[in-house]
Design a protein with these regions (language model features):
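A detector for small-residue-rich transmembrane helices and their helix-helix packing motifs
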Residues: 1-223
């Protein structure tokens, strides 16, 4: 079987808990006193220097708005459940928190000293890199493509945003850092990581070929 498909709810107990925590933390942050949120929940250089080191963890669960939250939770569901299914919950948690915490810390030099950081995006990027090197052909019905292809496209978009200095509230650099942190984990956990990397690149090539064929030969038939 070329693409592996499994029960989407199999082996995702930790993923479910993380998603619930993100929803609860975000809902609290949206309704709480802004000063409390700024000092006790979001991550920033000032909070770190003030000794509020827990914010490097709490900030992972807090999201800026509903769109930010829902978008991240979709990708957390896809990649978190996949990693739990092919590895185990402990490795999934290790990748998630390592990616989130270290990405926040390493992002500080790239942003103004008064910048604040929230969201699970960087942690999820760590998961995408691990999954890409472990199970790239796992098909996601939610995203309608293999997870290896999603990971590569996800990375390329953010790399392009960094290269072209796209102005946005999104911390693209943090995403790239998170993805980079996931690569050594994927290499360590997957004996076939080289093959899986080539598979992911092959999926990307096939995607662009298909896109070219559709735009060149199919779309003109309807225009």
């Amino acid at each position: 079987m070329l693409f592996s498909v499994s029960d989407p709810f199999l082996g995702m107990r930790v993923t479910t808990v993380l998603i619930l925590l993100c929803f609860l933390a975000s809902l609290y942050a949206w309704t709480a006193n802004p000063v409390t949120v700024q000092n006790d929940l979001v991550f920033s250089l000032s909070n770190l220097l003030a000794g509020r080191v827990w914010t490097v963890v709490t900030a992972i669960f807090v999201h800026a708005n509903l769109l930010h939250l829902v978008g991240n939770m979709i990708f957390l569901y896809v990649f978190g459940s996949t990693l739990e299914g092919v590895a185990d919950s402990k490795r999934m948690l290790l990748a998630f928190f390592l990616g989130g915490i270290v990405s926040f810390l390493l992002s500080l030099p790239f942003f103004p000293s008064d910048a604040t950081f929230v969201g699970a995006s960087a942690a999820i990027f760590t998961l995408t890199a691990v999954v890409m090197l472990m199970k790239p052909l796992r098909f996601s019905f939610l995203l309608l493509m293999p997870v290896g292809l999603v990971a590569v496209l996800y990375f390329l978009y953010n790399a392009a945003a960094v290269y072209y200095h796209l102005q946005s509230d999104v911390a693209y650099v943090s995403h790239i850092i998170g993805f980079s942190l996931g690569l050594p984990l994927g290499i360590a956990w997957s004996p076939q990581w080289k093959r899986n990397l080539l598979v992911s690149i092959g999926l990307l090539a096939a995607y662009f070929v298909l896109l070219y064929l559709i735009t060149t030969y199919v779309l003109p038939l309807f225009l």
